[in-house]
From Swiss-Prot:
Signal sequence coordinates: 1-21
Modification note: Phosphorylated on Tyr residues after T-cell receptor triggering by LCK in association with CD4/CD8.
Region (NUMB-binding region): 170-187
Comp. bias regions, Polar residues: 192-202
Protein name: T-cell surface glycoprotein CD3 epsilon chain
Organism (species): Felis catus (Cat)
Residue positions where Phosphotyrosine is found in the record: Y183, Y194
Single GO MF descriptor: transmembrane signaling receptor activity
One of the GO BP terms on file: cell surface receptor signaling pathway
Residue spans, topological domain Extracellular: 22-125
Functional summary from the UniProt entry: Part of the TCR-CD3 complex present on T-lymphocyte cell surface that plays an essential role in adaptive immune response. When antigen presenting cells (APCs) activate T-cell receptor (TCR), TCR-mediated signals are transmitted across the cell membrane by the CD3 chains CD3D, CD3E, CD3G and CD3Z. All CD3 chains contain immunoreceptor tyrosine-based activation motifs (ITAMs) in their cytoplasmic domain. Upon TCR engagement, these motifs become phosphorylated by Src family protein tyrosine kinases LCK and FYN, resulting in the activation of downstream signaling pathways.
UniProt main location, coarse: membrane
Subunit structure comment from the entry: The TCR-CD3 complex is composed of a CD3D/CD3E and a CD3G/CD3E heterodimers that preferentially associate with TCRalpha and TCRbeta, respectively, to form TCRalpha/CD3E/CD3G and TCRbeta/CD3G/CD3E trimers. In turn, the hexamer interacts with CD3Z homodimer to form the TCR-CD3 complex. Alternatively, TCRalpha and TCRbeta can be replaced by TCRgamma and TCRdelta. Interacts with CD6. Interacts (via Proline-rich sequence) with NCK1; the interaction is ligand dependent but independent of tyrosine kinase activation.
Lineage: Eukaryota, Metazoa, Chordata, Craniata, Vertebrata
């Protein structure tokens, strides 16, 4: 079997196992979510407060709210305000209905809220990431060129005249060292013991 077909078969197997596992995870005690095109809930989050707005097709009759099949007391308006929303305690299936409603439309709500969160749209998030990457790359290039120049200057200072070629850099300005006095050349006009060859008669 070619490798491409093997990957397709493996993908189909994983997909079927995932769908089968998802069906098994449904709790039969929880209400099944039913949504129609006309029943659309509106959800707005501000800080730690979540506001649910009932669909418009229910009219202005007395609206009741329930969560996970239990009626919420003292909640009869078109909007349901959930202050200090907790993901663990307040998540679940919500429904709003009137006494004349034939069926209930459920909304599964699971949200994470925080006190000082700021909502950022997609373009702003992408711009922040791109700017961060560009600044980081620019900083890395500056460090690279600075370390490269520092290494080149240190190699130039350490190289001596015998390392091949003329001395460069600061060695160019220094005068050559004074010769050793033991090997100092004889000056003209100076007569020392060994300044010339004397012939002796035999």
């Amino acid at each position: 079997m070619p490798s491409g077909s093997l990957w397709r078969v493996l993908g189909l197997c994983l997909l079927s196992v995932g769908a089968w596992g998802q069906e098994d995870n449904e709790d039969p005690l929880e209400p099944s979510p039913q949504t129609s095109a006309s029943a659309r809930y509106k959800v707005s989050i501000s800080g730690t407060t979540v506001v649910l707005t009932c669909p418009e097709d229910l009219g202005s009759e007395s609206i009741k709210w329930e969560r996970n099949g239990d009626l919420l007391p003292n909640e009869y308006g078109e909007q349901l305000f959930l202050d200090d929303f907790s993901e663990m305690e307040n998540s679940g299936y919500y429904a709003c209905y009137t006494s004349n409603s034939l069926e209930k439309n459920y909304l599964y709500l699971k949200a994470r809220v925080c006190q000082n969160c700021v909502e950022v749209d997609t373009m702003t998030a992408v711009a922040i990431v791109v700017a961060d990457v560009c600044i980081t790359l620019g900083f890395l290039l500056l460090v690279y060129y600075w370390s490269k120049n520092k290494k080149a200057s240190s190699v130039t200072m350490m190289r001596g005249p015998g390392a091949g070629g003329r001395p460069r850099g600061q060695n160019k300005e220094k005068p050559p060292p004074v010769p050793n006095p033991d090997y100092e050349p004889i000056r003209k006009g100076q007569q020392d013991l060994y300044s010339g060859l004397n012939q002796r008669g035999i």
